[in-house]
């Protein structure tokens, strides 16, 4: 099994801290269906911070014989998104991807990406074709649960390195640790994740931006499984921001999420948020 990608060195703790909290959108709905020929349709909609609605529809087709995947998407910002993926490109473990986004009479983006995975290596290469162009590469190597990785960004037109970062980690079945130095080694973070029992998970992350602040920002989160179909989560940051959520599988393929957040340092002010999410899959 290949190690995690560089951006996922802290995935377990990041997911615990960030996923399945529903207060950021007052309402969110997504529907996923699969046609008899294997085409997957996904429709998503949610409210945004400025009280507008963000919506998108995607169709994804996979040809297992050739390893070709085509995803076509369209959103209410009138952006047409197309992704073409080809697995086992030239050699086992290598995947190529062309990802484009076009807004009529507006912005255009095109990225050419390559992914390579083997039992102890995970390497990625991203080309932003219309900006720069800029190449970003990252590499992770692993041995006995330990991982080490690095990321490098290079502006081809100016022949300059525009970013670099490094990270290390360790993970087993019950816990994981990770430390990274990003933004040209100016932002440092450390995270841990611990599966205390089959019912309880805890995790925390500390971040220090050596340029912007002398303070260390700390977040802590926990998850408790009520039963096989529901769980609750809570997180708190040193800033006082506290979030709670409840997730319930109503029936196979139907999931309801309820969330709330409040500022523990400003309980008398109207800064609290409520939200819900409803997901359907068939």
Swiss-Prot record:
Entry's Gene Ontology molecular function annotations: porin activity; voltage-gated monoatomic anion channel activity
Coiled coil feature spans: none
Record flagged with keyword Magnesium: no
KW Nucleus (keyword) present: no
Recorded family membership: Belongs to the eukaryotic mitochondrial porin family.
Miscellaneous notes: Has antigenic properties. Elicits a specific immune response in systemic candidiasis human patients undergoing malignant hematological disorders.
Protein name as it appears in the record: Mitochondrial outer membrane protein porin
Organism: Candida albicans (strain SC5314 / ATCC MYA-2876) (Yeast)
């Amino acid at each position: 099994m290949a190690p995690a990608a560089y951006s996922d060195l802290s995935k377990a703790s990041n997911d615990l801290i960030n996923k399945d909290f529903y207060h950021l959108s007052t309402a969110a709905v997504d529907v996923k269906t699969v046609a008899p020929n294997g085409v997957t349709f996904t429709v998503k909609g949610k409210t945004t911070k400025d009280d507008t609605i963000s919506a998108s529809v995607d169709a994804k087709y996979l040809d297992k014989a050739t390893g070709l995947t085509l995803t076509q998407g369209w959103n209410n910002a009138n952006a047409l998104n197309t992704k073409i993926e080809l697995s086992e490109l030239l050699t086992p473990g290598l995947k190529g991807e062309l990802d484009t986004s076009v807004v009529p009479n507006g912005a255009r983006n095109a990225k050419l990406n390559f992914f390579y995975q083997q039992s102890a290596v995970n390497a990625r290469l991203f080309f932003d074709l219309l900006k720069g162009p800029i190449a970003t590469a990252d590499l992770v190597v692993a041995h006995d649960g330990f991982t080490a990785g690095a990321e490098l960004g290079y502006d081809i037109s100016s022949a300059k390195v525009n970013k670099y970062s490094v990270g290390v980690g360790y993970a087993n079945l019950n816990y994981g640790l990770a430390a990274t130095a990003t933004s040209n080694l100016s932002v440092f973070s450390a995270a841990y994740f611990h599966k205390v029992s089959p019912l309880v998970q805890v995790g925390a992350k500390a971040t220090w931006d050596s340029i912007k602040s002398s303070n260390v920002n700390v977040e802590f989160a926990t998850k408790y499984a009520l039963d096989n179909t529901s769980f609750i989560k809570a997180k708190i940051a040193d800033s006082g921001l506290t979030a709670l959520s409840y997730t319930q599988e109503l029936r196979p393929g139907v999931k309801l999420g309820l969330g709330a957040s409040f500022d523990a340092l400003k309980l008398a002010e109207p800064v609290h948020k409520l939200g819900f999410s409803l997901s359907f899959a068939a």
